[in-house]
């Protein structure tokens, strides 16, 4: 074919878009971006409820800027590149700014995987400044870019007369009355030489601590919490009732003078900041400075990025300004921002990504946490692939599903979390729906005379997420107690995820108090599968401990080419194991822990809801481990400070065959908890009408329970067999589990000492101490506070933290304070340590 023929077809030209096609595409894209960015700006500035992170807005804004630069004729009148912020809310008087409140151009310094910043945009800013100053060498001031609300304060003759929000940069809202409630804004300027007029620009914000306190109050009052401190500050400042604003504890930092008449005239911005302080304003001291060149500025920026999580307020970058006000004037402005300043943003702490899967993690305490597995996204200086979903309630509230596009936040060292779902990007599928055919028939009606038109509707591709019913590690049931947000694996020490924490608690000072065995050694023993259960600690020996240490030190020992501690090198060069003191100390500590107080042993078991105080109550009520193991749930629920939830937890623990086997192993290993004096006899607290009223599945008041007890002849056997008792009771006792519970109660009470036997000291009770309330104050000569408390409680006494008329004795040591004074005022007996020991016998 002749290449010069006019009929020759150039397929490349056919596929290449024409200029008109490109222009049409650009026009459509500009229109879409303008609408989208205006909607996002409305959400951010007007509703105070942004739906996308700042980084997403910035990316789209730059895309629109680039398109408008290439096609200036296509720029729309409402393009966000031509204005600042959003329109003011209704409800406040409008204020027109004599000097427009402009925003700043953004600059970014992205980090690579090693945390190294790319400061190319800041070096370009520095070069533009130098070019604008004909090669001059500018100084820069760098200060925090607060994440709050821009405010303009107008003072006449030193008195605050007006406060206005930025609004759209030209017109804002009059919030004078609300601003007057901000405690660190001077209502009258300080100093003698105050200007006749000065307009101060700055940022209103909420400190992190005040934000936490506010959200706590919101939750307590059943109100919706704020998403972040900026939203809280904006919402507080826009309250029509200034009394509400006053309760919110807002804060203000100034950053520029918009206009001024008379008074001190600064030549540099750093002088302006000092002038603000002289007038009575607060400054972010220690977090701003003046530097001679851009490299010093960037070093301070990196320092502040590291310091950011420790600051008392939220910042999302640093503002860099030319220090000389004359140079600022020379550089001037572009359409929407000054040429002499830039907002140097920190790496994004929020980003968009997709949820690829949701599974659960089991924590060291058994807490079950749903975790979103994410498409990798770079946020907060690191690549994030996982984010916490906290608990089932949070998953349901946010409605996070597999496939969703979500906003992920990572701030400092905080664990990444899913903030919200972008619902318009949720993957959907089409499904057929039954519809009317227009004459009364449905599409699924077999008798329809005419078929209906097919119709479909969009539904989410994935179902709502629900926690699994069993632990993925040990297959134990996952349980969630009523009123608690966190679900937990019920496996305890049976679950490998909980094993290390359980052993650390078991060996801790307030539990078994195993001297020499710390967290590090326990974690190494568990990691190497040398210890699985509590009893395994009592089977440890020197070779096992040496193996643990040698394995843990292997990498270090190899790199240093030195023998690890506890070994020696013979003539052959081979390592020979030798007994070492550290291992002997651990074994000695384990041996010494074999006869713990009963309360310590019970606390060491790690029973859910059983802290030190509850463990002591159990010991004082039952006296021996065997009685505690067999205590029925209704009896437990009658004891002081033990309600239904705690009683159920204790009974559930001892009802598990695995937990009973674990205790039997400890006893077989030589652990022998001491017998405790019974000072809270169940017969006194678990009176028949009380435990009957707490029987599971049988609702009855204590008064009616008392009547039932009397009808049964005041004995459990009557409750079991008397056929004259009410039919609802007979129906309840006929259930096998309930019949077994009654038999257990009968056996249990038969083996417990009576109240009289307990009072006579059959369990070794000290009559002079039993039932008495003691308060400890000051430093005792020889006893530590917890030692004195243990001695008193072992003798049947009770230790309280405060002095009252019900206090029997105050034990006072050196530097006793107000408790001793109150004891003397109330006439309470005061004992020295020696007198206490005498009383204890």
UniProtKB/Swiss-Prot annotation:
InterPro entries: BRCT_dom, BRCT_dom_sf, DisA/LigA_HHH, DNA_ligase, DNA_ligase_AS, DNA_ligase_CS, DNAligase_adenylation, DNAligase_N. It holds the Pfam family HHH_2. One of its GO terms (biological process) is DNA repair. NAD(+) binds at residues 54-58, 103-104, 143, 166, 203, 321, 345. Residues 764-841 form the BRCT domain. HAMAP family: DNA_ligase_A. Belongs to the NAD-dependent DNA ligase family. LigA subfamily. This is DNA ligase. The gene is ligA.
């Amino acid at each position: 074919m002749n290449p010069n023929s006019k009929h020759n077809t150039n397929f490349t030209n056919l596929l290449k878009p024409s200029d008109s096609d490109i222009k049409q595409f650009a026009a459509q894209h500009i229109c879409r971006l303008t609408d989208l960015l205006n909607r996002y700006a409305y959400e951010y500035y007007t509703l105070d409820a942004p739906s996308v992170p700042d980084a997403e807005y910035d990316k789209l804004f730059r895309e629109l800027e680039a398109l408008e630069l290439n096609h200036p004729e296509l720029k729309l009148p409402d393009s966000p590149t031509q204005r600042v912020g959003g329109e003011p809310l209704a409800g406040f008087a409008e204020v027109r700014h004599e000097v427009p409140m402009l925003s700043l151009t953004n600059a970014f310094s992205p980090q690579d995987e090693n945390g190294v910043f790319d400061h190319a945009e800041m070096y370009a800013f520095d070069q533009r400044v130098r070019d604008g100053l004909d090669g001059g060498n500018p100084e820069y001031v760098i200060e925090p870019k607060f994440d709050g609300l821009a405010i303009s304060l107008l003072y006449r003759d030193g008195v605050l007369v007006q406060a206005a929000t930025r609004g759209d940069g030209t017109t804002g809202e009059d919030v004078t009355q609300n601003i007057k409630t901000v405690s660190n804004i001077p209502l009258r300027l300080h100093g003698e030489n105050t200007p006749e007029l000065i307009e101060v620009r700055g940022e209103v914000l909420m400190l992190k601590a005040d934000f936490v306190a506010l959200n706590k109050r919101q939750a307590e009052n059943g109100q919706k919490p704020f998403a972040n401190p900026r939203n809280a500050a904006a919402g507080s400042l826009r309250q029509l009732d200034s009394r509400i604003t006053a309760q919110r504890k807002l804060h203000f930092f100034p950053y520029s003078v918009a206009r001024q008449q008379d008074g001190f005239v600064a030549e540099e911005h750093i002088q302006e900041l000092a002038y603000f302080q002289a007038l009575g304003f607060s400054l972010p001291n220690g977090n701003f400075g003046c530097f001679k060149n851009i490299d010093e500025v960037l070093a301070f920026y990196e320092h502040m990025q590291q310091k950011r999580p420790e600051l008392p307020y939220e910042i999302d970058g640093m503002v860099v300004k030319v220090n000389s006000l004359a140079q600022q004037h020379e550089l001037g402005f572009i359409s929407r921002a000054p040429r002499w300043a830039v907002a140097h943003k920190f790496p994004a702490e929020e980003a968009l990504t997709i949820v690829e899967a949701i599974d659960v993690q089991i924590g060291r305490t058994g807490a079950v946490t749903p975790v979103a597995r994410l498409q990798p996204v770079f946020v907060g200086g690191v690549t994030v692939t996982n984010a916490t979903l906290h608990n089932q309630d949070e998953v349901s509230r946010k409605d996070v599903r597999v496939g969703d596009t979500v906003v992920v936040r990572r701030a400092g060292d905080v664990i990444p979390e899913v903030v919200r779902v972008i619902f318009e990007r949720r993957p959907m599928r089409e499904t057929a729906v039954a519809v009317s055919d227009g004459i009364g028939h449905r599409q699924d009606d077999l008798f329809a005379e005419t078929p209906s038109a097919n119709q479909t509707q969009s539904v989410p591709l994935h179902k709502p997420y629900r926690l699994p019913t069993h632990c993925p590690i040990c297959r134990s049931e996952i349980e969630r107690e009523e009123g608690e947000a966190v679900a937990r694996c019920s496996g305890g020490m049976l679950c490998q995820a909980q094993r290390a924490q359980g052993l650390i608690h078991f060996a801790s000072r307030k539990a078994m108090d195993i001297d020499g065995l710390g967290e590090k050694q326990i974690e190494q023993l568990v990691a190497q599968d040398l210890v699985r259960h509590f009893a395994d600690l009592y089977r440890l020996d020197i070779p096992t401990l040496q193996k643990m240490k040698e394995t843990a030190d292997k990498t270090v020992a190899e790199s240093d080419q030195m023998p690890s501690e506890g070994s020696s090198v013979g003539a052959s060069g081979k390592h020979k194991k030798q007994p070492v003191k550290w291992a002997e100390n651990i074994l000695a500590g384990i041996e010494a822990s074999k006869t713990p107080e009963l309360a310590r042993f019970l606390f060491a078991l790690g029973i859910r809801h059983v802290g030190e105080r509850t463990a002591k109550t159990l010991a004082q009520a039952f006296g021996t481990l065997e009685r505690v193991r067999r205590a029925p749930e209704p009896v437990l629920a009658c004891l002081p400070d033990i309600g239904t939830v705690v009683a159920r937890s204790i009974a559930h623990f001892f009802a598990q065959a695995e937990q009973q086997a674990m205790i039997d192993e400890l006893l077989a290993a030589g652990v022998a908890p001491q017998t405790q004096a019974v000072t809270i006899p169940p017969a006194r607290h678990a009176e028949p009408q009380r435990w009957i009223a707490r029987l599971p599945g049988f609702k009855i008041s204590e008064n009616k329970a008392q009547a039932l007890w009397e009808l049964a002849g005041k004995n459990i056997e009557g409750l079991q067999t008397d056929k004259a008792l009410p039919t609802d009771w007979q129906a309840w006792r006929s259930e096998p589990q309930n019949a077994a519970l009654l038999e257990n109660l009968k056996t249990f009470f038969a083996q417990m000492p009576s109240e009289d036997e307990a009072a006579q000291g059959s369990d070794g009770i000290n009559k002079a101490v039993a039932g008495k309330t003691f308060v400890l104050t000051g430093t005792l000569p020889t006893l530590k506070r917890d030692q004195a408390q243990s001695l008193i409680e072992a003798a049947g006494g009770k230790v309280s933290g405060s002095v009252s008329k019900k206090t029997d004795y105050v034990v006072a040591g050196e530097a006793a304070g107000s408790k001793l004074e109150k004891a003397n005022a109330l006439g309470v007996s005061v004992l020295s340590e020696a007198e206490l020991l005498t009383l204890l016998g």
